[in-house]
From Swiss-Prot:
Encoding gene (name): NCE102
UniProt key word NAD: no
Highest rank taxon of the organism: Eukaryota
Bilayer-spanning residue ranges: 11-30, 38-62, 76-93, 138-157
Record membrane topology: Multi-pass membrane protein
Record note on domains: The C terminus is necessary to target MCC-specific transporters into MCC and for the formation of the plasma membrane invaginations.
Source species of the chain: Saccharomyces cerevisiae (strain ATCC 204508 / S288c)
Protein name as it appears in the record: Non-classical export protein 2
Similarity remark: Belongs to the NCE102 family.
Length: 173
C-alpha cells in the first residue's frame, strides 16, 4: 500500500491532468492547422494519467507493483514529459496578451482566436502544476528508495525490521 501523501498527490494530479486534457482537447478540436506541440501535450497528459493514476490504483492493491524503483522511474518520466509539454506550449504561445490581435492572428497555436489563447495559457498553468506534483512525488520516491531499497516496499521492510519475517527468534518460540 502506498503512503497517504502519495495517494493524495495522485488524486490532485489526476484532477490537474483531466483539466489539462479538457483544455488541450478543446485546442485540438478547434484547430485549423496541424500543431505537433498541442499533440505532444495531449500525449503527456494521457501518459501521466495512465502511469500515475491507473498504475497507482493497482500499486495500492497489488504490492509487488509498488516497487520504489518502478515508482521512481514512472514519476521521473512523468515529471520530464509534463515539464516538456508545459515548456513547449509556453514557448509556442510566447506569453503575450490574448487581447493583442496581431499576436493572436500570427501565432500557430492560437490561430486567430482569443479563446484558444486563453485555453493554451490555462493548459500551460495546469501542466506546470502537474509538473510540480510529479517533482514532489519523484523526491518522495527517492526517499522511499533510500529507506526501503529499490525493490522493497514500505510495509515489507517494516515487517522485516520488527523480526516478523524469517526464522523466529528465541522470544517468539
Amino acid at each position: 500500500m502506498l503512503a497517504l501523501a502519495d495517494n493524495i498527490l495522485r488524486i490532485i494530479n489526476f484532477l490537474f491532468l483531466v483539466i489539462s486534457i479538457g483544455l488541450i482537447s478543446s485546442l485540438l478540436n478547434t484547430q485549423h492547422r496541424h500543431s505537433s506541440r498541442v499533440n505532444y501535450c495531449m500525449f503527456a497528459c494521457a501518459y501521466g494519467i495512465f502511469t500515475d493514476s491507473l498504475y497507482g490504483v493497482f500499486a495500492n492493491f497489488i504490492e509487488p507493483l509498488a516497487w520504489p524503483l518502478v515508482l521512481f522511474t514512472l514519476d521521473f518520466l512523468n515529471f520530464v514529459f509534463t515539464f516538456t509539454a508545459g515548456t513547449v506550449l509556453a514557448v509556442g504561445i510566447r506569453a503575450h496578451s490574448c487581447n493583442n490581435s496581431s499576436y493572436v492572428d500570427s501565432n500557430k497555436i492560437t490561430q486567430g482566436s482569443g479563446t484558444r489563447c486563453r485555453q493554451a495559457q490555462a493548459a500551460v498553468a495546469f501542466l506546470y502544476f502537474s509538473c510540480a506534483i510529479f517533482l514532489a512525488k519523484t523526491l518522495m520516491s527517492v526517499f522511499n528508495m533510500i529507506s526501503n531499497g529499490a525493490f522493497g516496499s514500505g510495509s515489507f521492510s517494516k515487517r522485516r525490521r520488527t523480526g516478523q519475517v524469517g526464522v523466529p527468534t528465541i522470544s517468539q518460540v
